[in-house]
C-alpha cells in the first residue's frame, strides 16, 4: 500500500510510523523510499541521460507499480531535488529501523530494465506487454551475458547509499505480465544468484498475488532462500486452501510463507466485510 498512503511522507511522519512498528512487533517492513535514486545512478552509469532516466522512473505517486514492473515514467519527470530529498529520507528511515532491530526489505534486482534497453544497450529482453494500458518496463533475459553485470551494478549502487539488506523484494511479471519466451526456471535462478552474490545470507521476499510468484520460477530454488507473502490470505489464500479462488494445489512448495491480511488496502477506515471469514481463514491456515 506504499503508493496509496506513504508516497509523500516526510521524516516526521516516517519517524512516527517506525516507532509504531517497533511498538507493535513489526520487524520486516518494506523500505522502498529512495529506490528511484538507485535507479538514477544505475542508468547514468549505463549511459542514459537525465531525460531518458526520467522517462523510466515513475513519479512519486506511482512508484509502487513502477517497482513491481507494471509501468514506467508515469507521473514524472521528477526534479533533481526529489531524488536528493528521497535519498536523504531513506538514509534516516533505514538508520532508525536498524537501531530498533527492524530488518528493512529493499527492492532487489528483478530483471527490470527500461523498455528501450534493447535499442539503447543492445540487451536481449522480453516484452511483458501492457498493464491496464500502461507500457511495462522490459524484462532482461536471464541468458543475456549482461544480466549479472547490470544486477551487480544495481546492488553496488544500492549498497553505496543504504548498505546491504538481508531481505530483498522482487516481483517480476506482476499482475499478468507476459512470460512469453522467458525461461522461468532460469529467471528465478538468475535473480536469486544476483542477490546472493551481493549478500550470501540474503532472502528473497515475494508477494503471492494472482499468478505470482510463478511456480516454475521458484520450484527449483533452495528452501530457506525465499519467503512468500500470502498477501490476501484472509480472502483469497494461496497456501493451499481448495476453497480459495486463488487456490494453489501445492501451495508454495518447499518455501517458507507468511500469512498476510490486506484488509483496508491502506488508509481506508470502517469496520465491514466478511468478518467471520477473516477469523476462520487464519485458523484454517494454522492447521
Predicted regions and their residues:
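N-terminal hydrophobic targeting/anchoring segments and the immediately downstream early-domain regions
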Residues: 1-16, 28
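Catalytic-core regions of glycoside hydrolase
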Residues: 4-5, 22, 27-69, 75-287
Amino acid at each position: 500500500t506504499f503508493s496509496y498512503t506513504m508516497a509523500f511522507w516526510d521524516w516526521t511522519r516516517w519517524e512516527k510510523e517506525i516507532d509504531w512498528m517497533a511498538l507493535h512487533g513489526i520487524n520486516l517492513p518494506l523500505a522502498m523510499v529512495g529506490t528511484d535514486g538507485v535507479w538514477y545512478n544505475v542508468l547514468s552509469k549505463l549511459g542514459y541521460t537525465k531525460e531518458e532516466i526520467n522517462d523510466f522512473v515513475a513519479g512519486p505517486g506511482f512508484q509502487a507499480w513502477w517497482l513491481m514492473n507494471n509501468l514506467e515514467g508515469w507521473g514524472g519527470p521528477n526534479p533533481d531535488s526529489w531524488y536528493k530529498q528521497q535519498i536523504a529520507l531513506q538514509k534516516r528511515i533505514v538508520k532508525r529501523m536498524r537501531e530498533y532491530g527492524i530488518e528493512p526489505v529493499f527492492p532487489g534486482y528483478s530483471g527490470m530494465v527500461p523498455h528501450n534497453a534493447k535499442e539503447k544497450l543492445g540487451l536481449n529482453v522480453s516484452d511483458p506487454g501492457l498493464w491496464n494500458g500502461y507500457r511495462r518496463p522490459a524484462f532482461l533475459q536471464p541468458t543475456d551475458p549482461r544480466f549479472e553485470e547490470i544486477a551487480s551494478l544495481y546492488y553496488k549502487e544500492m549498497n553505496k547509499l543504504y548498505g546491504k539488506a538481508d531481505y530483498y523484494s522482487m516481483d517480476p511479471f506482476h499482475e499478468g505480465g507476459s512470460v512469453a519466451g522467458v525461461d522461468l526456471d532460469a529467471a528465478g535462478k538468475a535473480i536469486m544468484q544476483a542477490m546472493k552474490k551481493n549478500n550470501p545470507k540474503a532472502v528473497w521476499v515475494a508477494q503471492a498475488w494472482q499468478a505470482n510468484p510463478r511456480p516454475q520460477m521458484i520450484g527449483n530454488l533452495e528452501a530457506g532462500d525465499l519467503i512468500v507473502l500470502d498477501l490476501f490470505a484472509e480472502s483469497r489464500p494461496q497456501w493451499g486452501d481448495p476453497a480459495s479462488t486463488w487456490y494453489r494445489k501445492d501451495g508454495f512448495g518447499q518455501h517458507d510463507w507468511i500469512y498476510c491480511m490486506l484488509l483496508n488496502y491502506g488508509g481506508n477506515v470502517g469496520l465491514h466485510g466478511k468478518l467471520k471469514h477473516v477469523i476462520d481463514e487464519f485458523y484454517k491456515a494454522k492447521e
